[in-house]
Amino acid sequence: MASRKAGTRSKAAATKQAQRGSSNVFSMFEQAQIQEFKEAFSCIDQNRDGIICKSDLRETYSQLGKVNVPEEELDAMLQEGKGPINFTVFLTLFGEKLNGTDPEEAILSAFRLFDPSGKGVVNKDQFKQLLLTQADKFSPAEVEQMFALTPMDLAGNIDYKSLCYIITHGDEKEE
């Protein structure tokens, strides 16, 4: 009996600790980001029960054109939540993955590699070539779509600080 109570107490303590850890999750994001996560959660929660389950994941993958997702992959995704994945857990999982990263600073650092003079611009043609040929290659159509929103000077240089703002905050300027 004593060992049973001890086991119960540690479960309760673990639950309290998990709740304390996740209670701060909403302060990690701006309200607009939370709303976007809520929309993503709603898209995944196919049966609208407030919990993401295996059938929700399978149906979401199916809608994205991936029909033969291995059971192990779905199980691994669900195990990250260490229990039922409601919206708070969903947000916590993203918070843990994004914690300590400043996407804007990471993007600026990457652009600075291509701006040895430190002028805040990169050459459009050189950048286009990188996008088409390196790492996760962009299609020509994707590159043109991106350049449609990209701030450039008359010489065809990309203002990467403004582009970084667009990437991390959207193309609408706050007033």
Curated annotation (Swiss-Prot):
Keywords: Acetylation, Calcium, Metal-binding, Motor protein, Muscle protein, Myosin, Phosphoprotein, Repeat. Pfam families: EF-hand_5. It comes from the Eukaryota. Myosin is a hexamer of 2 heavy chains and 4 light chains. The modification Phosphoserine is found at residues 22-23. Disulfide bonds: none annotated. Ca(2+) binds at residues 45, 47, 49, 56. The keyword Acetylation applies. Residues 32-67, 102-137, 138-173 form the EF-hand domain. PROSITE patterns: EF_HAND_1, EF_HAND_2. This chain binds calcium. One of its GO terms (cellular component) is cytoplasm. GO terms for molecular function: calcium ion binding. Signal peptide: none annotated. One of its GO terms (biological process) is cardiac muscle tissue development. This is Myosin regulatory light chain 2, atrial isoform. The modification N-acetylalanine is found at residue 2.
